C-alpha cells in the first residue's frame, strides 16, 4: 500500500508542478524522486484486470528518466514528462480498479491483486515517499491490529429506519399515541405523538422512550440537537402494525415538553443532555431519548377544538426533535458523506460487472454493510477506501 500511495503522490505532484515556464529548481526534488521511482520500476512486468469486464493488461516498465535543465521548463520538457505521467496514471488506475473488485474473508486489509502484491515485495521498498497521510497511518495501524483513529464529518452512523411504535390505538385509530422515528446517515429524528394531548396522563404529562444503538462506538462527538423532525412532520398515511389497514398520522407540533438524552458506552452512563443546541459527548455506543409531553394548563378555543375532550381526534399533538452528529472520531472505518471514496469503490465494482463476492452484498450497499458490520467487512473496507483515495489522486 505504501508503495502504490507513493507512486500516486509522486505522479500527482509531478502533474501539478511541471508546467511551461516553471523554474527547474522549483521542481528538481519531484523530478529526482520520479527518476528514482522509474529506476526501481523499470524491468518489471505487472498484470492487471481479468475480473468482470476489466480487460487483462500487461505493464512492461521501460520508461525514460526525466532530464535536467538550467533554464525554465519549455514545452518539449513538459510534453516528454506528460507521457510518463499518463503512463503511470493509467497504471495506478488499473491497479486500483483491479484491487477494488477483489475481497477476502480473511486478511481482507492486505493487497489482493497480483500487481499490488508484487509492489508490496521487498524489491520496491525504496519507493516510500510522502507517506505521512492519515489514510496510510490508519491502514498501517489497523494491519497491526492497533487502534487507529478516524476523524469524520457527518459520518453515516445510523441505519435507515422509518417506522413507529404504538403505545395506544383504538380499532379505528381515531385515538393513537406512540412514537415515530426516522434515522439515516448522521441524523436521528423523533416524534412523540398523542391524539389526546396527554389528557388522561398523570400530572398531565405523558412519557415516551426511544432506545437506539450504534454499530460502532464513537468518541469526541460534536452534535446538534434541535426542535422539529422535518422528515416525519407531514400528514402521512401509515400501515397499521398488522398491515391490515391504514391510519392517518396528522401531527401538530407541540412545544410544551421536555426531553433527556442519555448516552451509554458498554452499558455505562457517560453523559446526559437536556438542552437544544450544540453539545459534546465524550463517547457512546447507545443512547436513550426520553420525552415528556406536557398538556398546557390553558388553551385557546381554537386549540381546544383541535384536541377536544373525549374526541373525535383528527390530529396528534407531537413533540419533535432531531439529533445530528456533526463530527466524531472512531476506531472503525465508516462511510463519510464528505468523502467520495465509498462511491468510487461502488462505481468501479458496478461498472466492472464484478461477480458476487464472499464479503459484501452485490451493489456494495452501505445500509446492508452497516446493519451487519463484520470484522471481515471492516478489514476489506479499510483497504478499499484507501485504494479509492489513491485512485482519486490521479483521476
UniProtKB/Swiss-Prot annotation:
- What does the entry give for GO biological process? fusion of virus membrane with host plasma membrane
Keyword flag Nucleus: no
User: What are the record keywords, sorted?
Assistant: Capsid protein, Intermediate capsid protein, Virion
Coiled-coil regions listed:
none
Q: Does the keyword Plastid apply?
A: no
Q: Which InterPro entries match?
A: Capsid_hemagglutn, Rotavirus_A/C_VP6, Virus_capsid_a-hlx_vir
The superkingdom listed in its UniProt entry is Viruses
Q: Which GO terms describe its molecular function?
A: host cell surface receptor binding; structural molecule activity
- Intracellular or extracellular location(s): Virion
Any Gene Ontology CC annotation: viral intermediate capsid
Query: What is the protein's quaternary organization?
Result: Homotrimer. Interacts with the inner capsid protein VP2. Interacts with the outer capsid glycoprotein VP7.
Q: What does this protein do?
A: Intermediate capsid protein that self assembles to form an icosahedral capsid with a T=13 symmetry, which consists of 230 trimers of VP6, with channels at each of its five-fold vertices. This capsid constitutes the middle concentric layer of the viral mature particle. The innermost VP2 capsid and the intermediate VP6 capsid remain intact following cell entry to protect the dsRNA from degradation and to prevent unfavorable antiviral responses in the host cell during all the replication cycle of the virus.
* Entry similarity comment: Belongs to the rotavirus VP6 family.
Name the UniProt record assigns to this protein: Intermediate capsid protein VP6
Task: Look up and give the organism this protein is from.
Answer: Rotavirus C (isolate RVC/Human/United Kingdom/Bristol/1989)
Amino acid at each position: 500500500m505504501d508503495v502504490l500511495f507513493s507512486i500516486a503522490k509522486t505522479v500527482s505532484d509531478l502533474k501539478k508542478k511541471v508546467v511551461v515556464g516553471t523554474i527547474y529548481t522549483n521542481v528538481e526534488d519531484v523530478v529526482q524522486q520520479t527518476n528514482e521511482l522509474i529506476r526501481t520500476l523499470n524491468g518489471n512486468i505487472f498484470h492487471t484486470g481479468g475480473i468482470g469486464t476489466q480487460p487483462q493488461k500487461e505493464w512492461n516498465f521501460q520508461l525514460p528518466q526525466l532530464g535536467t535543465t538550467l533554464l525554465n521548463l519549455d514545452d518539449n520538457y513538459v510534453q516528454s514528462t506528460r507521457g510518463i505521467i499518463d503512463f503511470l496514471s493509467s497504471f495506478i488506475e488499473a491497479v486500483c480498479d483491479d484491487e477494488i473488485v477483489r475481497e477476502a474473508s480473511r486478511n481482507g486489509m492486505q493487497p489482493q491483486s497480483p500487481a499490488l502484491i508484487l509492489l508490496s515485495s521487498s524489491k520496491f521498498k525504496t519507493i516510500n515517499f510522502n507517506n505521512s497521510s492519515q489514510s496510510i497511518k490508519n491502514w498501517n495501524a489497523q494491519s497491526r491490529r492497533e487502534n487507529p483513529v478516524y476523524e469524520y464529518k457527518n459520518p453515516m452512523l445510523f441505519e435507515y429506519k422509518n417506522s413507529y411504535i404504538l403505545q395506544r390505538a383504538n380499532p379505528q385509530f381515531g385515538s393513537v399515541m406512540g412514537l415515530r422515528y426516522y434515522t439515516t446517515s448522521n441524523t436521528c429524528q423523533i416524534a412523540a405523538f398523542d391524539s389526546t394531548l396527554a389528557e388522561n396522563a398523570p400530572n398531565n404529562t405523558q412519557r415516551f422512550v426511544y432506545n437506539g444503538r450504534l454499530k460502532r462506538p464513537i468518541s469526541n462527538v460534536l452534535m446538534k440537537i434541535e426542535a422539529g423532525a422535518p422528515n416525519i412532520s407531514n400528514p402521512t398515511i401509515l400501515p397499521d402494525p398488522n398491515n391490515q389497514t391504514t391510519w392517518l398520522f396528522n401531527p401538530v407540533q407541540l412545544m410544551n415538553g421536555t426531553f433527556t438524552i442519555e448516552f451509554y458506552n458498554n452499558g455505562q452512563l457517560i453523559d446526559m443532555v437536556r438542552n437544544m443546541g450544540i453539545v459534546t459527548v465524550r463517547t457512546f455506543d447507545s443512547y436513550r431519548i426520553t420525552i415528556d409531553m406536557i398538556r398546557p394548563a390553558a388553551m385557546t378555543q381554537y386549540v381546544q377544538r383541535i384536541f377536544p375532550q373525549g374526541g373525535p381526534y383528527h390530529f396528534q399533538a407531537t413533540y419533535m426533535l432531531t439529533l445530528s452528529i456533526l463530527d466524531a472520531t472512531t476506531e472503525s472505518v465508516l462511510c463519510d458523506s464528505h468523502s467520495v471514496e465509498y462511491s468510487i469503490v461502488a462505481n468501479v465494482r458496478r461498472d466492472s460487472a464484478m461477480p458476487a463476492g464472499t464479503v459484501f452484498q452485490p451493489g456494495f450497499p452501505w445500509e446492508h454493510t452497516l446493519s451487519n458490520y463484520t470484522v471481515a467487512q471492516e478489514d476489506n473496507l479499510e483497504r478499499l477506501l484507501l485504494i479509492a483515495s489513491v485512485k482519486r489522486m490521479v483521476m
